[in-house]
């Protein structure tokens, strides 16, 4: 009885750096969304000291909503870009 399933694996393994670069080229708005999320959270934490008389919970909720809105916007633009690439920019055979 043979245990060979007929699946062949590539003879090389892709390191994490090249895999990240390849994935960023396939979906360019994912790194943009992650970077925007990190920037908004960093800015919100920086402005935490000068929030005035706003409650901490309200400030954190506003920061979370802004970060999530940026990520959803980046996902929407990325989806539109990939649809454009696939349906309109693709040459007709």
Swiss-Prot record:
Keywords: Acetylation, Electron transport, Membrane, Mitochondrion, Mitochondrion inner membrane, Phosphoprotein, Respiratory chain, Stress response, Transmembrane, Transmembrane helix, Transport. GO terms for cellular component: mitochondrial inner membrane; mitochondrion; nucleoplasm; protein-containing complex. Induction: By hypoxia. The modification N-acetylserine is found at residue 2. The chain crosses the membrane at residues 26-46, 60-80. GO terms for biological process: cellular response to glucose starvation; cellular response to hypoxia; mitochondrial respirasome assembly; negative regulation of apoptotic process; negative regulation of release of cytochrome c from mitochondria. It is found in: Mitochondrion membrane; Mitochondrion inner membrane. Proposed subunit of cytochrome c oxidase (COX, complex IV), which is the terminal component of the mitochondrial respiratory chain that catalyzes the reduction of oxygen to water. May play a role in the assembly of respiratory supercomplexes. Associates with cytochrome c oxidase (COX, complex IV); proposed complex component. Also associates with respiratory chain supercomplexes. This is HIG1 domain family member 1A, mitochondrial. It comes from Homo sapiens.
């Amino acid at each position: 009885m043979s245990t060979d399933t007929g699946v062949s694996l590539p003879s090389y393994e892709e390191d994490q750096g090249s895999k990240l670069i390849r994935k960023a080229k396939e979906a360019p708005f994912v790194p943009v969304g992650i970077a925007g999320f990190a920037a908004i959270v960093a800015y919100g934490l920086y402005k935490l000291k000068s929030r005035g008389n706003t409650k901490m919970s309200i400030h954190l909720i506003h920061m979370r909503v802004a970060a999530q809105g940026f990520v959803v916007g980046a996902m929407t633009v990325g989806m539109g870009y990939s649809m454009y690439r696939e349906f309109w920019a693709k040459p007709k055979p």
